[in-house]
């Protein structure tokens, strides 16, 4: 016998809405309920929120507990925060109900070094309920960690890995452009970064930690540098209608590295700014053989993130129990034709 995978979604922000639309399109997914704390969404039907025809029977609940009392979910998908501390109570609630968990929380993509105690608790709880928990996304979760890990498979030896993600941020949604500082003065950029009003890119450390563990480098120094603003050389108007004068911030550069015995082994670089003339994702493996992969045009972040989440549903359900990372799951791939068997 086979049937669709049942899913409850928590979080209907800009990225959550994109994922919800894809859930509704997938023939192997049954989106049972959506949860969001926004009072303006209370008891509204999902189709009106997403401005689509599908999903008319799905209403928005204010709490996960209510949704779980109504429906049994194979997977609870959480898209609420980058902070694991904030997301952990929802994860625990989902696990206790017997549901697997997939989350876009960047800190969950590799939480073991930054949250050792909490990671141990989540792992033990998930194993006690025979479910799995994973943090994912296009980045962290795939392009700058899992993909370079997999690309090393045909290498006899690996000395050094460099990954670069180059983005034209003008093509991305408004919250992304704002979190990388678009439209700020250089002084405002640094003040807001320091006060965590804007986050810049989150996840380079987690990506390095995942690569380091997968390849067994055992790096003794991992460092993320402060994000550096990129200044616009001309006046422009953002995709959401804000005028940005010449000399103001139009994006940022973030980078992180890992060393072993003073030798650099991993270098990650994330560059995103408006009207970037070249978009790509590149991976260089210095080893035997040397490998250079470049995805011309890059992978669209929002489309890719939604696809990663939705394609992961069958993989997570069939994975071993516990707190996992993307490298621990069955090989990720397109899964629309995969149904649940019982």
Residues of each region from the PLM?
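N-terminal Rossmann-like dinucleotide-binding module
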Residues: 1-51
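Active-site-lining helix/loop region of Rossmann-like oxidoreductase modules
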Residues: 6, 10, 14, 152-279, ...
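Short, ordered loop/turn segments at secondary-structure junctions
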Residues: 37-39, 81, 105-109, 138-139, ...
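Conserved N-terminal Rossmann-fold NAD(P) cofactor-binding segment
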Residues: 38-71
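Rossmann-fold NAD(P) dinucleotide-binding segment
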Residues: 66-75, 84-106
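General beta-strand structural signal in soluble alpha/beta enzymes
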Residues: 103, 133-136, 162-163
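Rossmann-fold NAD(P)-binding glycine/threonine-rich loop
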Residues: 106-131
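C-terminal helical cap and adjacent loop that interface with cofactors, partners, or active-site loops
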Residues: 273-342
């Amino acid at each position: 016998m086979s049937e669709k995978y049942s899913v409850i979604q928590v979080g209907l922000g800009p990225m959550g809405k994109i994922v919800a639309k894809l859930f509704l399109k997938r023939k192997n997914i049954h989106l049972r309920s959506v949860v969001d704390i926004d009072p303006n969404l209370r008891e509204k039907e999902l189709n009106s929120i997403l401005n689509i025809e599908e999903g008319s029977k799905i209403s928005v609940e204010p709490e996960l507990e209510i949704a779980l009392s109504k429906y049994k979910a194979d997977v609870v998908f959480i898209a609420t925060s980058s902070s694991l501390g904030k997301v952990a109570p929802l994860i625990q609630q989902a696990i206790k109900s017997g549901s697997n968990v997939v989350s876009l929380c960047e800190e969950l993509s590799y939480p073991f070094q930054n949250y050792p105690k909490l990671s141990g608790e989540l792992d033990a709880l998930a194993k006690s309920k025979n479910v799995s928990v994973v943090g994912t996304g296009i980045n962290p979760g795939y392009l700058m960690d899992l993909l370079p890990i997999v690309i090393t498979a045909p290498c006899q030896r690996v000395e050094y890995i460099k990954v670069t993600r180059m983005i034209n941020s003008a093509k991305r949604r408004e919250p992304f452009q704002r979190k990388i500082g678009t439209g700020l003065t250089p002084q405002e950029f640094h003040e807001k970064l320091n006060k965590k009003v804007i986050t810049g890119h989150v996840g380079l450390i987690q990506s390095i930690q995942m690569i380091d563990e997968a390849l067994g480098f055992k790096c003794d120094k991992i460092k993320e540098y402060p994000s550096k603003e990129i200044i616009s050389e001309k006046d422009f108007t953002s995709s959401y209608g804000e005028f940005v004068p010449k000399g103001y911030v139009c994006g940022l550069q973030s980078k992180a590295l890992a060393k072993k015995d003073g030798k650099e082994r991993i270098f990650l670089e994330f560059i995103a700014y408006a009207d970037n003339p070249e978009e790509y994702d590149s991976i260089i493996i210095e080893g035997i053989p040397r490998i250079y992969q470049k995805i011309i045009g890059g992978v669209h972040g929002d489309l890719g993130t939604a696809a990663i989440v939705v394609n992961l549903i069958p993989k997570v359900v069939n994975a071993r129990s516990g707190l996992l990372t993307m490298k621990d799951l069955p090989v990720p791939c397109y899964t629309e034709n995969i149904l649940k068997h019982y």
